[in-house]
Swiss-Prot record:
It comes from Candida glabrata (strain ATCC 2001 / BCRC 20586 / JCM 3761 / NBRC 0622 / NRRL Y-65 / CBS 138) (Yeast). Component of the Mediator complex, a coactivator involved in the regulated transcription of nearly all RNA polymerase II-dependent genes. Mediator functions as a bridge to convey information from gene-specific regulatory proteins to the basal RNA polymerase II transcription machinery. Mediator is recruited to promoters by direct interactions with regulatory proteins and serves as a scaffold for the assembly of a functional preinitiation complex with RNA polymerase II and the general transcription factors. One of its GO terms (biological process) is transcription open complex formation at RNA polymerase II promoter. Belongs to the Mediator complex subunit 18 family. The keyword Lipid metabolism does not apply. GO terms for cellular component: core mediator complex; mediator complex. This is Mediator of RNA polymerase II transcription subunit 18.
Length: 266
């Protein structure tokens, strides 16, 4: 389990070129383009699960997230780009207003088709961020594992998650750029698309989400946690007046789920 300290901000579409140039100068690192498919799973309401752990403590059911990268040539619909590289301005400017270039059937196929059983997935569970009105950064405990291969009679990600007692909840795609700053500070700037079976909606139309974070390997490493917080606050000060970094709403980052009667009857 690691601790992730983070801050978030937003920028408008028209501000992206200046943002990219400014962060490139500040960090001294180039923008790395990425596209990720994020699939969120909820506890299967058909199963009766004991919510008490071995210490007789109440454990609330939580969602799990699986993530994998999407080949950028699929985003651009250009197989040549795989060898020639992808320009971040080209891919993000192209996707500001146009429809998402990948059909939702292709994305659902990645989790339901046995022929995709060699796709690597990162499985993540997360606690609700630490409470406290005086917190200057968000702090969240995260656990990650890697699914490198799905086996069995029906080797799909959906079947693997079903065997773990989870069913599909929703999925989304993030496409953006990543910068690596000093002292392990990572900066992501991306757009988000909500993927449903009947349509794809750009949630961030007109702008981008900016997420900066530091990951600390041990929750007991107080010195490292304090240093990570100081580095994030330093970046916040450096970009004040241009980016308004804030602590994200902890409730929006809560992976716990309360199963209602409506959920059970679906």
């Amino acid at each position: 389990m690691v601790q992730r300290l983070s801050l978030m901000a937003t920028i408008a579409d028209d501000d992206f070129p200046l943002f990219k140039t400014s962060i490139n100068i500040l960090t001294g690192s180039p923008a790395v383009v990425y596209a990720n498919l994020m699939v969120v799973w909820k506890p299967n309401p058909n199963y009766e699960v004991d919510n008490l752990n071995s210490k007789n403590e109440l454990v609330e059911p939580t969602r799990m997230t699986t993530a994998t990268s999407i080949p950028l040539e699929l985003i651009l619909n250009d197989p040549v780009s795989k060898n020639n590289g992808v320009d971040s301005d080209e891919i993000l400017n192209t996707m500001k207003e146009q429809e998402f270039p990948i059909k939702q059937e292709q994305l659902f196929d990645m989790i339901n088709n046995p022929s995709n059983n060699t796709i690597n997935w990162t499985l993540t569970t997360a606690d609700i961020p630490a409470a406290g009105s005086n917190r200057k950064v968000s702090m969240q405990a995260i656990q990650e594992a890697t699914i490198v291969h799905q086996a069995g009679n029906n080797p799909t990600l959906a079947n693997v998650m079903a065997e773990l007692g989870y069913s599909f909840d929703y999925m989304y795609v993030t496409v953006g750029v990543r910068f690596v700053h000093k002292r392990d500070v990572i900066i992501h700037c991306h757009k988000v698309w909500d993927i449903a079976e009947d349509n794809i909606i750009q949630v961030t139309k007109g702008g981008y989400v900016v997420h900066t974070f530091v990951t600390v390997n041990r929750a007991t490493d107080i010195e490292r946690l304090n240093l990570a917080e100081a580095n994030l606050l330093s970046l916040q000060r450096d970009l004040s007046g241009y980016l308004d970094f804030k602590v994200p709403d902890r409730k929006s980052m809560d992976s716990r789920t309360n199963l209602t009667q409506k959920d059970i009857t679906l």
